[in-house]
Design a protein with these regions (language model features):
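Charged, flexible cofactor/metal-binding loops and thiol motifs
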Residues: 119-120, 124, 131-132, 146, ...
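Glycine-rich cofactor/substrate-binding loops
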Residues: 1-39, 97-101, 283-463
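A general structural motif at alpha-helix termini
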Residues: 61-65, 218, 263, 274-276, ...
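A helix-coil-helix interface module used to build multimeric assemblies
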Residues: 1-204, 209-216, 278-279, 292-294, ...
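Short, well-ordered beta-strand elements within core beta-sheets of diverse protein domains
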Residues: 43-53, 169, 239-247, 371-379
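Charged/polar positions within long, soluble alpha-helices
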Residues: 45, 49, 70-77, 95, ...
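Residue-level detector of short coil/turn "hinge" positions at structural boundaries
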Residues: 54-55, 222, 383, 400
Length: 463
């Protein structure tokens, strides 16, 4: 028996066409099931406010959709092999239980604005979860930095020892680097937090839709006002989200690379606990940093997810194209990668051990050369003269007298330096970002709870 679609006259589809257009998409489409039902609950609020749905029909549809939501959470609603997409699965489930009335659900709506709405609800949920996970890692790094702020080790330029640094400065730098990306989410959020409903296929509908009512019911801050921009922006929004993820990914990849390098026997600054290292099937002494290597690799793969989206959207004319369906996989896969990296690194950082003796030994005479130059400058030498004198000393193979660790720190009291890491200010930034996250999570969950007819879930969600 050939499946039937929501479009056309209801004639059967060739199974080969369905396989080509839908089979690979179902695993990704299935993730939108909850959001499709909630989006439909918001849509019928707009229909009721527009006078396109009677109070009685609205109440029955709302009850049916709420039952669908419960059934979906219990696994009783799912995409079947004969369903073309998540929208088909939900509408046909509803229509089987509310014959005639279920067929009113799609009034004033296209699958084009429907999927755009589903994706934005999905993105709001996932972005808030990713930001919270990133803040957990920031806080772990700040705790690590505070615990080791006076442990000196060499700082590197060109992968060569350069000047004194500290474990605290290193960890604090990664915390602030992550915060820079975390704090950019509110700007991206303004683009996600706009309702596309009512734009239909991209040109609106000849009905008196009150688009604002559906947007308000779904907790969106506003509308994508121009109906054509909803489809024109497909791929653009996904790319913006993945770019935000790649910025987190790049920071995590650099952090992972440092841990891999500094935990190698040749450095020995950091030690991985047994719980974070794997072994070899042939070499019994090995403790491999697989977690960090795979974080580095996933960050590279995340770049590929962004590239896929950019390539898919870059050469299309205005209006809707079926190519847009292929945006879901790299988007969701990229978000999955980001979540996995944040979770693993957040768990790993507190378990790293610092070898103070190896760190101190790593400084060496070369890394202290600039300190000697500045010591002579403070005594009255011109900088360039002092620079040449120290260079000549080192060139003859002679070492410069090393200052004490306390002296090294004491001479670096400028804001953000070894003697003043600014960890309190970074922690304040983290708390501010958490407050924003909590406010937006609360607003989002309250809107979803009202639609579902239940109390807000609270906490984090995902997938």
């Amino acid at each position: 028996m050939t499946p039937r679609s929501l479009w056309g006259s209801g004639s059967g589809l060739d199974q080969r066409l369905l396989d080509l257009t839908a089979a690979d998409d179902r695993p990704w489409d299935s993730r939108l099931l909850r959001w499709d039902i909630l989006g439909s609950l918001g849509h019928i609020e707009g229909l009721r406010a527009s006078g396109l749905l009677s109070a009685r029909d609205h109440a029955r549809l709302r009850q049916g959709l709420r039952r669908a939501l419960v059934a979906a959470e219990q696994g009783a609603v799912a995409l079947r092999p004969e369903d073309e997409d998540v929208h088909t699965a939900v509408e046909q489930w509803l229509t089987r239980r509310l014959p005639g009335l279920g067929e009113r659900l799609h009034t004033g709506r296209s699958r084009n604005d429907q999927i755009a709405c589903d994706l934005r609800l999905y993105l709001k949920d996932r972005l808030l979860t990713l930001q919270a996970d990133a803040l957990d890692l920031v806080d772990a790094l700040l705790v690590f930095a505070r615990a080791h702020q006076k442990v000196l080790w060499p700082g590197y330029t060109h992968q060569r020892r350069a000047m004194p640094s500290s474990v605290g400065l290193w960890a604090g730098a990664y915390a602030e680097g992550l915060l820079d990306t975390i704090e950019s989410l509110p700007e991206l959020w303004t683009r996600v937090d706009r309702s596309p409903l009512g734009s239909a296929a991209g040109y609106g509908v000849p009905l008196p839709l009150r688009r604002e009512a559906a947007a308000q019911a779904l907790g969106f801050a506003g509308l994508d006002r121009n109906v054509a921009t909803v489809q024109g922006g497909r791929g653009k929004l996904e790319a913006a989200v993945l770019f935000w993820c790649t910025q987190l990914g790049h920071e995590l990849a650099r952090l992972a690379q440092d841990v891999i390098l500094y935990s190698a026997e040749e450095f020995g600054y950091l030690t991985l606990p047994h719980e974070l290292a794997t072994g070899s099937s042939i070499m019994p002494h090995k403790r491999n940093p697989d977690l960090f290597e795979l974080t580095r690799g996933r960050a590279a793969a995340l770049d590929g997810d962004l590239s896929s989206v950019l390539q898919l959207k870059s050469k299309l004319s205005s209006g809707y194209h079926r190519d847009f369906q292929l945006l879901k996989e790299p988007l969701m896969r990229g978000i999955d990668r980001t979540e996995s990296m944040l979770a693993s690194m957040g768990a790993a950082v507190p378990q790293l051990t610092v070898n103070r003796e190896r760190c101190a030994a790593g400084l060496g005479s070369g890394a202290l050369a600039t300190d000697e130059v500045m010591r002579r400058v403070e005594k009255g030498s011109a900088f360039r003269v002092a620079y040449r004198e120290v260079a000549d000393t080192l060139g003859r193979g002679e070492a410069v007298a090393p200052p004490s660790a306390s002296r090294i720190v004491a001479r670096r009291r400028s804001t953000g330096g070894l003697g003043d890491l600014g960890l309190t200010a970074a922690a304040a930034r983290s708390r501010a970002a958490r407050r924003w996250n909590g406010q937006e999570r609360g607003r989002f969950e309250r809107a979803m709870a009202r639609l579902a007819g239940r109390g807000p879930r609270g906490g984090r969600r995902g997938r």
